[in-house]
Every structure is written in C-alpha cells, then in structure tokens.
C-alpha cells in the first residue's frame, strides 16, 4: 500500500496533500476551517445538483418549481433547506477563516492570500445569483437593486446593466443566465481551491506563534485528519439543527411571495452574510462612491500585506493590535445589524460611523499600532 501511495502518479498527489503533508504541530482549531469550507463546497455542489434536476429557470414556473421540490420531491424539502442553510454555514466558515488569516498574519503568504480573495469574490457572486433563483419578491428586487449599481459606472454603466439583464429590466433572460452562472461557478471555485492549496503547500501552513515551524512538523494523517473529522461532525450537527428545527430563520419572509415587478417590498435587503457590505454601500450618499466602497470593503484585504508594519507576524503577542482587531470584529457585527435596518435616523448615522471606523482601523490604526509595538519591544 505504501508503494502505491508514494509512487502512483495520481495517488501521490493526494498523499502529498492530505497524508504525508508536513504540518506544524501546534496549529489550533482555527486551522480547521479550510477543510470545513471544502466540506461546505461539496455539500453545496451535491445538493445543488439534485435541486437543478427539478428546478426550471423560467419566470413563470421558477417559484412553482421550488414549491414542487419542497412538496412533491422525495426529501426535496431537506435538499432545498440544506442548500439554503449550507450557504450560511459556508459564509460563517469563510468569515472565520479570513478572520483567522488576519489575526495570525497569514496574509504574508501573498499568493495564497490573493487566491483566497478571488475565491471570496467568486463565492459571493455565486451566492448572490443563487438567491435570485427562487424568484420570490426579495430575489427579484435584490437582483434589480444590486445589478442596477453597475449603472453608476461612467459612460458604459447603463449599457452594461442592460447587457447583464438581457433586456430593459430583470426578466426571463436574467433568470436563465443567472441559473447558468450559478451552476458553473461552483466548479470554477473548486478549480480555484486547488490553486489556493497549491500555493499554500509551496510555503507550508502558518501557525499560532507566527514563527517558522520547519523544525517541528508532524504528518497530516492521522493527527489532523481526525481533528478535521471532529470539526466536520460539529459543522454537520450545526447545519442539521438549523435545517431540521429552524430552516427559515435566516431567510426573508418576503421570498415566500412570488416576484411582482409592480410591488416593491418595504425593505429590500440581501441575505445576512452580505449585510455588512450593504451597510457600507448605503452609508455613502453618492451612488458611484457607494459602489466603490462596497468593492473596497472586500478588496481592502488585498492591501493587508502592504499595511503590515509589525516585526512580528501575527497579533498573538501584540495587545494594542489585538484591541484594534476585536473592535474591528465588533464593528463588522454592527454593520451587519445596520444593513438589515431601514434607512432612517439613527441607523444612517450609525452606519456611516461604523463604515468610517471599518476602513480607519485597517488602514490607519492597525499599522500605527504595529509601529508603536515595535518601539515598545525595541524591534525597530
């Protein structure tokens, strides 16, 4: 068996990636989220495949086909809710994975980090298009509002929006192409994940101390395979509790009303995992400025290696930056809350303050804190 594992051209790849991979001996449970994201992706592709067998991407039948899946297809309700809530679990793992990267300075592995940002954008695009498919009120109006933002681009904006719509409004053509893109993107994401892992295995994993761990490595299997299995069981338990007891808790009741272009819902808002970005978008009165802030809210992650001023890699031993980090986490929770609130006083002002704070902490306060800590420790 050992000979096949180490010699066979295909199995050898798996061996070097998941079995004999030298791994730091001290990585904590925060390093579990990579494998959990892989599990989430597999769940989403499988449940999505079965949903696609029964779904019809036509404006007249899309809503009914989703109802048909839930009512008439064997375990259709289970597949549908696993897919919908699986997306939420996917984003929870994504945010924790990125948060871990920021905390422990993993962004210094630039290729891996940038690939991760591309993956984040791809997953967000997939989730957005998937939300449009049930063709409920929030699906339709969410698609209308978000695609309409592209009209803020000078000169080509209006033409671009109509090109994406395939007409003069969100209609049949839009739904069909969104379904096509929603189906193909997860497979593109899978390919990007392999590239992400390729870059990661060039440098090896980071670890909680932020120090070089070449002198203290252990094989990935059995130590981390069993650890990942525990994480997977906990994730599946959480997902199934959500699916079987509270399937609609994260959804919007408006999406149980079929899409009606003549009736606008009182509060148009995206799924919970986009609310922080939506709050940043709404906090800027100018349309183009809002769109740029929205893109920058994620793209700012790409500038983190440039903004790293500390002589230490992570923030494990840096109390000032740690304080900044947890204020940033709190700020993101506030933005998520604000994104779901109506556009009125005092929410507008809270959103604006939280948006400024978000960018200020990353661009100004964390780099300054790094310099101060260098001086205190005499590392400058």
Swiss-Prot record:
Compartment(s) of residence: Mitochondrion inner membrane
CDD domains the UniProt entry points to: cytochrome_b_C (cd00290), Cytochrome_b_N (cd00284)
GO cellular component, as recorded: mitochondrial inner membrane; respiratory chain complex III
Record-level GO BP terms: mitochondrial electron transport, ubiquinol to cytochrome c
Residues annotated as binding a ubiquinone: 201
Keyword Transport attributed: yes
A Pfam short name: Cytochrome_B
Membrane topology reported for the UniProt record: Multi-pass membrane protein
Coiled-coil regions listed in the entry: none
Record-annotated membrane-spanning stretches: 33-53, 77-98, 113-133, 178-198, 226-246, 288-308, 320-340, 347-367
Main localization of the protein described in the UniProt heading: mitochondrion
Record keywords, A-Z: Electron transport, Heme, Iron, Membrane, Metal-binding, Mitochondrion, Mitochondrion inner membrane, Respiratory chain, Transmembrane, Transmembrane helix, Transport, Ubiquinone
InterPro entries: Cyt_b/b6_C, Cyt_b/b6_C_sf, Cyt_b/b6_N, Cytb/b6-like_sf, Cytochrome_b, Cytochrome_b_C_euk/bac, Cytochrome_b_N_euk/bac, Di-haem_cyt_TM
Binding site for heme b b566: 97, 196
UniProt binding sites for heme b b562: 83, 182
Cofactor comment: Binds 2 heme b groups non-covalently.
Keyword match Transmembrane helix: yes
Complex and partners: The cytochrome bc1 complex contains 11 subunits: 3 respiratory subunits (MT-CYB, CYC1 and UQCRFS1), 2 core proteins (UQCRC1 and UQCRC2) and 6 low-molecular weight proteins (UQCRH/QCR6, UQCRB/QCR7, UQCRQ/QCR8, UQCR10/QCR9, UQCR11/QCR10 and a cleavage product of UQCRFS1). This cytochrome bc1 complex then forms a dimer.
Miscellaneous: Heme 1 (or BL or b562) is low-potential and absorbs at about 562 nm, and heme 2 (or BH or b566) is high-potential and absorbs at about 566 nm.
Family, as annotated: Belongs to the cytochrome b family.
Protein name (record): Cytochrome b
Annotated organism of origin: Synaptomys borealis (Northern bog lemming)
């Amino acid at each position: 068996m050992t000979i096949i594992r180490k010699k066979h051209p295909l199995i050898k790849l798996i061996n070097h990636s998941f079995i004999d991979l030298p791994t730091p001996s001290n990585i904590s449970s925060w390093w579990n989220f990579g494998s959990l994201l892989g599990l989430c992706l597999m769940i989403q592709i499988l449940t999505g495949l079965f949903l696609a067998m029964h779904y019809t991407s036509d404006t007249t039948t899309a809503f009914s086909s989703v109802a048909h899946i839930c009512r008439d297809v064997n375990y259709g309700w289970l597949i549908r809710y696993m897919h919908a809530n699986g997306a939420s679990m996917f984003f929870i793992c994504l945010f924790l994975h990125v948060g871990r990267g920021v905390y422990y300075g993993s962004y210094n592995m630039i290729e891996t980090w940038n690939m991760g940002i591309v993956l984040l954008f791809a997953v967000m695009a997939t989730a957005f298009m998937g939300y449009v498919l049930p063709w409920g009120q929030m699906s339709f109006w969410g698609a209308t509002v978000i695609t309409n933002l592209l009209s803020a681009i000078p000169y080509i904006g209006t033409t671009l929006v109509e090109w994406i719509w395939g007409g003069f409004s969100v209609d049949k053509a839009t739904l069909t192409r969104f379904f096509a893109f929603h189906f193909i993107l997860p497979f593109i994401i899978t390919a990007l994940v392999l590239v992400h892992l390729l870059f990661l295995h060039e440098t090896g994993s980071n670890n909680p101390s932020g120090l070089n761990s070449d002198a203290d490595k252990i094989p990935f299997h059995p130590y981390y395979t069993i650890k990942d299995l525990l994480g997977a069981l906990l994730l599946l338990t959480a997902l199934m509790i959500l699916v079987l007891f509270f399937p609609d808790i994260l959804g919007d009741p408006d999406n149980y009303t079929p899409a009606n272009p003549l009736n606008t819902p009182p509060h148009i808002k995206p799924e919970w995992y986009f609310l922080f970005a939506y709050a940043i978008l709404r906090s800027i009165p100018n349309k183009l400025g809002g769109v740029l802030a929205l893109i920058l809210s994620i793209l700012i992650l790409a500038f983190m290696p440039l903004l790293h001023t500390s002589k230490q890699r992570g923030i494990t031993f840096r109390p000032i930056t740690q304080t900044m980090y947890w204020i940033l986490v709190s700020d993101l929770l506030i933005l998520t809350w604000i994104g779901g609130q109506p556009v009125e006083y005092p929410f507008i002002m809270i959103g604006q303050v939280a948006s400024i704070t978000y960018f200020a902490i990353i661009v100004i306060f964390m780099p300054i804190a790094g310099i101060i800590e260098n001086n205190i420790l005499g590392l400058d």
